[in-house]
């Protein structure tokens, strides 16, 4: 039944006489499906096959373009550019279907957060594992201000997720890892502009949206966590305990059964193995999706933590996809995201300010990841990582054609609508190859056939309209059918290309190992496509050729003459060995002169 849960008349009061151009409106029905991510194209095709149905049409949602009521929304130029507003339209907000999910936790691992800010408090992550009084919250509004819930401040590490009762005592809304000993439980910040960086980041991650206050965030209704990483006695222009903060955010989210998206809007030069391994552990052991700012220097260089493996590195673009020559660019950058004139929350007076920096670009992108997770709750870290990068718009390279930045701004500028609506890519592995050849080895001049076995990993999407092709760097290799469509590969299934790839090795190729790439492409939709490649090595042996011995029986006789004549008359197509063995005068042409030489060889003249 394809998850159909309701069928109703499209126009309930349409009568038999309500007919126009052959369309009888009283006989049109609307079908509802449980899953809003169903493959509607295939469902439509299935319905059209039913004899009782004449026509099937999509019913597109028609509603006013959703604009949240946050008074500073019109100052947020980037919301429209990255199409967050279009992405929100997938939800029926007016009917109470709200984007976001409170179990999705976006962490500002930074200088700390003014978590009492009126645009943050309603989306504040509250650690209910520490809710000692059981009232369902860990903050209270008392005497005109928000405070940590006194009923939960019992001096006990209630959730004790690290099996150490003396560590994270009463971490009700996050943690200050820079405090004394294990830190302290209040990641609040001084009420001045020097310490506003983490608050500004938090607002971009998940400011409460549609609350008649301040700004909007793409994540809309996800939680925001504060992790303070610099002590108030230190210079707020530095992050002193950033990786400790990263680990807290990752583990706190993991053990609270939430989904952690961690933003690191800080960094610098210099690779550190310990930092890399910390990042990898947080990603693979604690399921944290990590974003980091690529840097604000107009140079091409690696920047850490953004250049570490398992981190989504984000550089900054300006309005209209502009590149204004102030942000870092590098081959390790994954995405570009708006980072100029970005308005968000600050500490002073619970106010707002417009800033620029990759520190802003990174949480703008991370907020999209929160929306993606709320749309696709089954997607995990590597899947969201893959899809947010794959769906970015490469228009930034068209707008900014300067050679020095090509390929250095990531896959493109983030696109919230594409990120939440594009079907999950497959994850393809090459599990086996078979080579069909005339001999036990591949010889110089041979022609072979290649068959591959490809497997699509479980929990990923279907490989749709896939193609494979073989590319080789050697000029002495000819691929007869270099691009080949193959059948779709469903998740957790394998596919064999029963029509083999035909490969000719020239007589001039050097013996030894030569490497080619099997390239796989699928799920192409305009600039979005899944691509992966697999190296395949061919070991080519030097051919031991006896000129004139076309049938390789180690003797030269009349049978070899017959084969040569048939080649000249095009009765047979020679293989690589026959091509060389029949060309007795080595002029690369097989003709009557070769027949004469062959006969003379037989007659021993």
Question: What does each of the following model-derived ranges do?
Answer:
Residues 110, 303-374, 378, 412-414:
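Extracellular S/T/G-rich loop segment that most often corresponds to the catalytic His/Ser-adjacent loop
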Residues 86-239, 257-260, 271, 307-310, ...:
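Subtilisin-like serine protease catalytic core
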Residues 512, 536-605:
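Cellulosome-associated attachment modules in secreted, modular CAZymes
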Residues 502-542:
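Terminal connector regions
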Residues 8-76:
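Autoinhibitory propeptides
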Residues 170-188, 337-364, 395-402:
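The feature captures the short pre-catalytic strand/loop hairpin that immediately precedes
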Residues 478-508:
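Intrinsically disordered, low-complexity Pro/Gly/Ser/Thr-rich segments with frequent PxxP/GP/PP motifs
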Residues 226, 241-247, 255-266, 272-278, ...:
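C-terminal subdomain of the subtilisin-like protease fold in secreted/lumenal serine endopeptidases
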């Amino acid at each position: 039944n394809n998850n159909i849960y309701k069928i109703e008349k499209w126009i309930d009061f349409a009568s038999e006489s309500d007919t126009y151009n052959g369309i009888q409106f009283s006989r049109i029905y609307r079908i509802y499906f449980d899953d809003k991510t169903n493959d509607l194209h295939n469902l439509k095709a299935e319905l059209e096959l039913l004899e009782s149905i004449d026509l099937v049409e999509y019913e597109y949602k028609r509603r006013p373009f959703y604009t949240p009521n946050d008074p500073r929304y019109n100052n947020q130029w980037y919301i429209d550019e990255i199409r967050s507003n279009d992405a929100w339209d997938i939800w029926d907000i007016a009917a109470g279907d709200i984007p976001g999910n409170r179990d999705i936790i976006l962490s500002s691992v930074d200088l700390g957060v003014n978590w009492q800010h009126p645009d943050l408090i309603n989306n504040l992550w509250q650690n209910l594992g520490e809710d000692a009084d059981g009232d369902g919250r860990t903050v209270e509004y008392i005497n005109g201000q928000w405070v940590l819930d006194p009923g939960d401040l019992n001096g006990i590490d209630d959730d004790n997720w690290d099996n150490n009762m003396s560590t994270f005592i009463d971490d009700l809304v996050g943690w200050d890892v820079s405090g004394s000993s294990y830190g302290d439980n209040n990641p609040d910040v001084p009420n001045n502009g020097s310490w506003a960086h983490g608050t500004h980041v938090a607002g971009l991650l998940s400011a409460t949206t549609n609350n008649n206050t301040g700004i909007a965030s793409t994540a809309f209704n996800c939680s925001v966590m504060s992790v303070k990483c610099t002590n108030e006695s230190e210079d707020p222009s530095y992050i002193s305990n950033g990786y400790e903060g990263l680990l807290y955010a990752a583990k706190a989210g993991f053990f609270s059964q939430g989904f952690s998206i961690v933003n690191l809007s800080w960094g610098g030069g210099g690779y550190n193995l310990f930092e890399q391994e910390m990042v990898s552990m947080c990603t693979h052991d604690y399921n944290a999706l990590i974003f980091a700012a690529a840097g604000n220097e107009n140079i091409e260089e690696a920047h850490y933590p953004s250049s570490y493996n398992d981190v989504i590195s984000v550089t900054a673009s300006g309005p209209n996809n502009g590149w204004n020559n102030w942000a870092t660019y590098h081959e390790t950058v994954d995405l570009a995201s708006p980072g100029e004139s970005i308005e968000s929350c600050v500490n002073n007076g619970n106010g707002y300010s417009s800033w620029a920096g990759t520190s802003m670009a990174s949480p703008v992108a991370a907020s999209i990841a929160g929306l993606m997770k709320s749309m696709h709750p089954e997607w995990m870290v590597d899947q969201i990582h893959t899809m947010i990068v794959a769906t970015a718009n490469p228009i930034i390279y068209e707008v900014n054609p300067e050679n020095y930045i090509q390929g250095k701004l990531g896959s493109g500028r983030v696109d919230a609508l594409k990120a939440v609506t594009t079907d999950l890519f497959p994850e393809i592995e090459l599990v086996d190859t078979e080579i069909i050849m005339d001999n036990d080895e591949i010889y110089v001049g041979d022609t072979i056939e290649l068959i591959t076995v490809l497997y699509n990993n479980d929990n990923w999407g279907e490989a749709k309209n896939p193609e494979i092709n073989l590319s080789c760097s050697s000029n002495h290799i000819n691929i007869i059918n270099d691009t080949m469509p193959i059948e779709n590969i469903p998740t957790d299934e394998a596919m064999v290309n029963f029509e083999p790839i035909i490969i000719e090795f020239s007589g001039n190729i050097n013996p030894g190992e030569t490497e080619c790439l099997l390239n796989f492409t699928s799920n192409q939709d305009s600039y979005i496509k899944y691509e992966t490649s697999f190296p395949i090595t061919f070991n080519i042996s030097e051919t031991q050729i006896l000129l004139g011995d076309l049938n390789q029986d180690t003797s030269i006789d009349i049978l070899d003459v017959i084969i040569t004549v048939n080649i000249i008359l095009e009765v047979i197509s020679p293989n690589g060995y026959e091509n060389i063995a029949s060309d007795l005068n080595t002029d690369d042409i097989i003709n009557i002169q070769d027949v004469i030489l062959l006969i003379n060889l037989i007659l021993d003249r």
